[in-house]
Amino acid sequence: MGNFFGRQRNAYVRVSLPAVCFVWQIAMIILFGVFIRYNEESDAHWVEHKKTNNITSDIENDFYYRYPSFQDVHVMIFVGFGFLMTFLKRYSFGGVGFNFLIAAFGIQWALLMQGWFHFLDHSTGKIYIGVENLINADFCVAGSLIAYGALLGKVSPVQLLVLTLFGVTLFAVEEYIILHLLHCRDAGGSMVIHAFGGYYGLGISWVLYRPNLHQSKRLHGSVYHSDVFAMIGTLFLWMFWPSFNSAITDHGDGQHRAAINTYLGLASCVLTTVALSSMHDKRGRLDMVHIQNATLAGGVAMGTAAEFMISPYGALIVGFCCGIISTFGYLYVTPFLEKYLKLQDTCGVHNLHAVPGMLGGFVGAIVAAAATESVYSKEGLINTFNFEGKYADRSVGTQGGYQAAGTCVAVAFGLVGGAIVGFILKFPIWGDPADDNCFDDEAYWEVPEDEETIPPVLEYNNHMIHKHQDIAETNFSVEQS
């Protein structure tokens, strides 16, 4: 078995990639034909529905309420996540292009998986979809995109499609357990999206550990313009994160509050990150790794508690703490994990998604357990935590306990599911790149030949362990030449 897994890698995907894409897309067409239908607000019978329910205006259609949030979330998925992964000096095509591939396949599979768990009409056997389903599908595929961040530059597009197939499936199951069986509240997905997606990617990366990855060390870094492109992704994510955390919250005060809390958490996180990044450098200079990534951790951590009455200063505290935790993670935890736990995390998703997501889940548990009628009002408590039906007698303390349990479920699903999927992806049939060919677009993309040679002085081995030592060596060699 060891010899089987240790066979020579071959990045040839001319047969496997078209085959997987064609077969799975045809399967989607068939499954959509069998199961998927328009819901009453997107069906042509909407006119009759308006008359029956005394609706006088099309403005009551959910499209006009949800679509602005859907637009923002959609931009985050395709532009924000995509460009955030373009920091590698020779892997920008793969960063944004494979992000596009994962998302395009994942949203189709997510509409089916989430539909079977949440929206299946048992009387007809059909799944009826509208604009809210599109938002949820984007949320679902976000978990797989986060996992991709841990594997960036080290896997083939076929492996990424397999990762997405299992990732969306696992997401739908853990989401059903957390939101329906445990009755947790997680509007912005700190638990179900970020904690799960982060640990899912880390679990896969741990199994796919490459002891000879140093052979691609020359490409495991950024250049000036690649970091600028990555910063574009950061800014899109940062600007639209309030929409992400509030997109599927209840109409009214909950959605309004979620946007405010996220807005403040993000702002606080930026200042904290800048302060720590500057403190770490002897000359007070800022590190783009921290600015691109750790500045977003506040939005991740505010996901669960976004619609709760955490208060504006509470949101600032969460962002402040996440800025510290995430920046320290990039400085010290990521090198530790690679050296001692053999965990290679290209984008540092452990610091941006996994830990802040887990922290956000526990923050939500504490805030839920501390909720009182004097702060929320009786009706406000019922509405915020959905204490209705069989949950009408649930206390806030019990709700806090279930919120904490939901966080543990998300982490467990991510780690265990990631390890299992990692073993599947370890089979040498997926066309993954050799150790000396990682982080290089030429393995899977036609790269223009007329690229200008980048002067060594503009290169710096960012997103790497011992990078400061490498910078010093590079600068020294340039000065001597």
Swiss-Prot record:
Family: Belongs to the ammonium transporter (TC 2.A.49) family. Rh subfamily.
Record's GO cellular component terms: apicolateral plasma membrane
GO annotation, biological process: ammonium homeostasis
Expressed in which tissues: Specifically expressed in the gill by pavement cells (at protein level).
Function: Functions as an ammonia transporter. May play a role in the elimination of ammonia in the gill.
Segments passing through the bilayer: 16-36, 68-88, 93-113, 133-153, 160-180, 188-208, 228-248, 259-279, 289-311, 315-337, 352-372, 405-425
Keywords: Ammonia transport, Cell membrane, Glycoprotein, Membrane, Transmembrane, Transmembrane helix, Transport
Known partners and oligomeric status: Homotrimer.
Subcellular locations according to the entry: Apicolateral cell membrane
Residue ranges that the UniProt entry lists as topological domain Cytoplasmic: 1-15, 89-92, 154-159, 209-227, 280-288, 338-351, 426-481
Major localization class: membrane
Annotated Pfam families: Ammonium_transp
PANTHER family found in the cross-reference section: AMMONIUM TRANSPORTER (PTHR11730), AMMONIUM TRANSPORTER RH TYPE C (PTHR11730:SF30)
Name of the featured protein: Ammonium transporter Rh type C 2
Membrane topology per record: Multi-pass membrane protein
GO molecular function, one term: ammonium channel activity
Organism: Takifugu rubripes
Extracellular side: 37-67, 114-132, 181-187, 249-258, 312-314, 373-404
